[in-house]
Amino acid sequence: MKLDGYTRLAAVVANPIKHSISPFIHNRAFEATATNGAYVAWEIEASDLVETVANIRRYQMFGINLSMPYKEQVIPYLDKLSDEARLIGAVNTVVNENGNLIGYNTDGKGFFKCLPSFTISGKKMILLGAGGAAKSILAQAILDGVSQISVFVRSVSMEKTRPYLDKLQEQTGFKVDLCALEYVSELQARIAESDLLVNATSVGMDGQFSPVPENIVLPETLLVADIIYQPFETPFLKWARSQGNPAVNGLGMLLYQAAEAFQLWTGKEMPTEEIWQSLTEKYQ
């Protein structure tokens, strides 16, 4: 990597963030595309967020990525939001366009790009969970022309989830069905007629539990995806593969959301195949 007086900076901003693999991905991409850039991780306190955003302009940076807890907190300090960032109510990428700071959310696009030979337009989807990742997938699916979405959450989370779905319907005219995860017969009935089943909860990170009962029967054409990438194969994905279903983990989402951000910053395509190889060697 060449560092000189013309090197432009990009960073991921969060707390905690030292464990992030984003610097690995983006610095590989800068090198592979002969882009004079460097990508670092900044672990900051909330009180430093305003100054950090100001530094994007001050140092003529490409921009920044954001992770928890700053995806929502950054919004008041930006000049403009993309459609999907407005719908999600969260930003994971800030682009410096000649001093104008524009907020995007590339998580949903990254998720759908990582699915092999699959387009969501006209399809039926089941989403488990309603946190930040789920919201980005939900909003992107609506923008991309999904025909039906069923969101399943634990019954204790129903009331907390409903206002966001109501607001989404106001903004898009699209009605999302909200169901309780405990109603297994309802889950089975909806899975039977769906094209895509997504785990957007953290259940499975421990390598022990699955978010759905193992007696659920999957239709053979159903694509199953998990946003978790460590462990590389969660119990949820193992269960889906044992029924013969295609199953995808969250590492591709991480790579392709980064590729979207890289293109917004540099105008260049990230060499995803090359970087995917390095990532799978590192995490498989």
From Swiss-Prot:
It is an enzyme of class 1 (oxidoreductase). It catalyses: shikimate + NADP(+) = 3-dehydroshikimate + NADPH + H(+). Keywords: Amino-acid biosynthesis, Aromatic amino acid biosynthesis, NADP, Oxidoreductase. This is Shikimate dehydrogenase (NADP(+)). Belongs to the shikimate dehydrogenase family. One of its GO terms (biological process) is aromatic amino acid family biosynthetic process. GO terms for molecular function: NADP binding; shikimate 3-dehydrogenase (NADP+) activity. Gene3D superfamilies: Leucine Dehydrogenase, chain A, domain 1, NAD(P)-binding Rossmann-like Domain. InterPro entries: Aminoacid_DH-like_N_sf (IPR046346), NAD(P)-bd_dom_sf (IPR036291), SDH_C (IPR041121), Shikimate_DH (IPR011342), Shikimate_DH-bd_N (IPR013708), Shikimate_DH_fam (IPR022893). Its EC number is 1.1.1.25. Shikimate binds at residues 20-22, 67, 92, 107, 229. The lineage of its organism: Bacteria, Bacillati, Bacillota, Bacilli, Lactobacillales. Homodimer. It comes from Streptococcus pneumoniae (strain 70585). Pathway: Metabolic intermediate biosynthesis; chorismate biosynthesis; chorismate from D-erythrose 4-phosphate and phosphoenolpyruvate: step 4/7. It holds the Pfam family SDH_C. Involved in the biosynthesis of the chorismate, which leads to the biosynthesis of aromatic amino acids. Catalyzes the reversible NADPH linked reduction of 3-dehydroshikimate (DHSA) to yield shikimate (SA). NADP(+) binds at residues 83, 129-133, 227, 250. The active site is at 71 (proton acceptor).
